[in-house]
Amino acid sequence: MASLRRRVRAIALQILFELDATDHSPDQVVARRLEEERLPPEGERFLRRLVFGAWEHASYLDRIIEETAPNWPVSQMPGVDKAILRIALFEALIDEEEKTPLKAIINEAVELAKQYGSDNSSRFVNGVLGTVVSRYRERRKG
């Protein structure tokens, strides 16, 4: 299951990156990627929840990112880093269905940053998420 969840997070990252860079419809992009990826039902549900949840709450999540990293405006942040942070923060602060442990959320985000981001992405993502978790811990038990 862990490898499926990592794969789904990587697909969600790619979808959010595309949505942020284009005017494509979230429904159409998700449908296209699901057709390409052929995920099992639990993977499909997880993907939909991550993408639509992070996209729907993007403004709120971006405010949290900017409060945490004021020297890095979200509008100037690399798209990969922004998408990874939105996914992880959605999972950590908003998603009530999964209850993924905070440590696992941060670890998965750092791994995505190592794989898809720049040389500094993993440190940046880890720093932002570590700070957010300590500030917002009361919003979610875990």
From Swiss-Prot:
GO biological process terms, alphabetically, are:
DNA-templated transcription termination; transcription antitermination
Q: Does the keyword Transcription apply?
A: yes
Q: What is this protein called?
A: Transcription antitermination protein NusB
Recorded GO MF terms: RNA binding
**Biological role:** Involved in transcription antitermination. Required for transcription of ribosomal RNA (rRNA) genes. Binds specifically to the boxA antiterminator sequence of the ribosomal RNA (rrn) operons.
Going by the UniProt record, its keywords in alphabetical order are:
RNA-binding, Transcription, Transcription antitermination, Transcription regulation
Stored Gene3D superfamilies: NusB-like (1.10.940.10)
What would be the name of the gene that encodes this protein?
nusB
Q: Which GO terms describe its cellular component?
A: cytosol
Q: Which family does it belong to?
A: Belongs to the NusB family.
Q: What organism does the record attribute this protein to?
A: Roseiflexus sp. (strain RS-1)
